[in-house]
């Protein structure tokens, strides 16, 4: 069972690991859904988590808001990805879309190639796709060796329990080609229900431990 703790900077990480978090998604600025953490934060978290054999997934996201990025933002993301890889992150968390509601294939191809050797999570930008495109995106991301997709299974703010049916559809369709990682609204109180209902071995959240 992997409980991925979504952390804003370093502060809560020691306590989370002590309580049983066995993977970290590292962000800054969770008020806007998480943005790229600073070099200093990445370094300190990798050092601490490394001592406890806990892998770290570093989010690469230049700002809050939507997931459609211009050329300068994509360049910033690419530089940040290279830096996080140099620092020794175990994986990266990315997601970028086009204006017309599909994956930004060109940008993602570059990021996936640059991240070779790292785990890759495609984040909740996935939830901004239409349901039809979500299934196509599973194919596209799985073909390129992306490790997992983080998804709430429905609109942000809905109880995750309301989205179990769609999450089950995604899990069945993914068919172990790529891992579906449920997140958003999972806490210590419902984590066992989520795992039992969806038959998943990995879950994600800020209140997961």
UniProtKB/Swiss-Prot annotation:
Keywords in alphabetical order: Cytoplasm
Places the protein is found: Cytoplasm
Gene inactivation effect: Mutant shows a significant increase in the intracellular copper concentration after 90 and 135 minutes of exposure to copper.
One CC-aspect GO term: cytoplasm
InterPro entries recorded: CutC-like (IPR005627), CutC-like_dom_sf (IPR036822)
Gene Ontology MF term list: copper ion binding
Induction: Induced late during copper exposure.
Keyword Cytoplasm in record: yes
Chief location of this protein within or outside the cell: cytoplasm
A Pfam family matched in the record: CutC
Domain of life: Bacteria
Keyword presence, Transcription regulation: no
Function: Might participate in the control of copper homeostasis; data from other bacteria suggests it is not involved.
UniProt record similarity statement: Belongs to the CutC family.
Name of the protein in question: PF03932 family protein CutC
Organism from which the protein derives: Enterococcus faecalis (strain ATCC 700802 / V583)
Gene: cutC
């Amino acid at each position: 069972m992997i409980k991925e703790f979504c952390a804003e900077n370093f502060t809560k990480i020691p306590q989370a690991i002590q309580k049983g978090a066995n993977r970290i998604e590292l962000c800054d600025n969770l008020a806007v859904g998480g943005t790229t953490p600073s070099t200093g934060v990445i370094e300190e978290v990798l050092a601490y988590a490394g001592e406890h054999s806990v892998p770290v997934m570093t989010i690469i996201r230049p700002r809050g808001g939507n997931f459609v990025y211009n050329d300068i933002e994509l360049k910033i993301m690419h530089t940040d990805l290279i830096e996080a890889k140099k620092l020794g992150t175990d994986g990266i968390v990315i997601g970028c879309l086009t204006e017309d509601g599909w994956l930004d294939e060109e940008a993602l191809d570059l990021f996936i190639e640059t991240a070779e050797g790292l785990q890759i999570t495609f984040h909740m930008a996935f939830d901004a796709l239409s349901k039809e495109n979500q299934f196509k995106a599973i194919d596209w991301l799985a073909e390129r060796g992306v490790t997992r997709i983080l998804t709430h299974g429905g609109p942000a703010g809905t109880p995750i329990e309301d989205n179990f049916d769609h999450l089950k559809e995604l899990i069945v369709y993914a068919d172990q080609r790529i891992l579906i990682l449920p997140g958003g609204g999972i806490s210590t109180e419902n984590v066992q229900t989520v795992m039992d209902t969806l038959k998943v071995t990995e879950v994600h959240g800020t209140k997961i431990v």
